[in-house]
């Protein structure tokens, strides 16, 4: 889990903590006097579907999309398929990083066709950054500690 990576200003795990932090972050993002930029990272987003954290997370995502702050949401590809409001809100931005995607995943997830590539051309950390229907191939670094 990303929680173990450290370096976060605030961390929540478990539905109650996630719900509370989502509400606090929404208030901070909507407050024009908040200084700096906030990056919100949600790991395993699909774990919060149809639970107490669902609506607060939808509100948070909407607030981030209307601001200059950043959202990073993580889930397995299969989890992005259903059209729950929480997932739809993230996908509607049509911006994302798809690592080792199948050709169809760009269309399914971000409404952007991706080129067919051999699996060997997409080692760990390689994929496509997609924004507003355009894509670029990217390679993320492997950080060793």
Residue ranges and their predicted role:
Residues 1-95:
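P-loop NTPase catalytic phosphate-binding loop
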Residues 5-8, 81-145:
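Phosphate-binding and hydrolysis-coupling loops of NTP-dependent motor/remodeling domains
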């Amino acid at each position: 889990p990303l929680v173990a990576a450290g370096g976060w200003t605030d961390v929540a795990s478990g539905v109650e903590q996630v719900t509370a932090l989502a509400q606090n972050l929404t208030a901070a993002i909507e407050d024009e006097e908040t200084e700096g930029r906030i990056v919100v990272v949600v790991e395993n987003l699909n774990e919060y579907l149809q639970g107490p954290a669902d609506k607060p997370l939808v509100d948070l995502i909407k607030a981030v999309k209307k601001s200059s702050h950043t959202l990073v949401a993580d889930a397995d590809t299969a989890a992005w398929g259903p059209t729950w409001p929480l997932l739809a809100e993230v996908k509607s931005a049509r911006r994302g990083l798809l690592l080792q995607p199948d050709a169809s995943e760009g269309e399914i997830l971000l409404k952007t066709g991706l080129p067919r590539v051999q699996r060997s051309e997409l080692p760990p950390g390689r994929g496509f950054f997609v924004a507003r229907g355009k894509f670029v191939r990217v390679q993320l670094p492997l950080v060793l500690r």
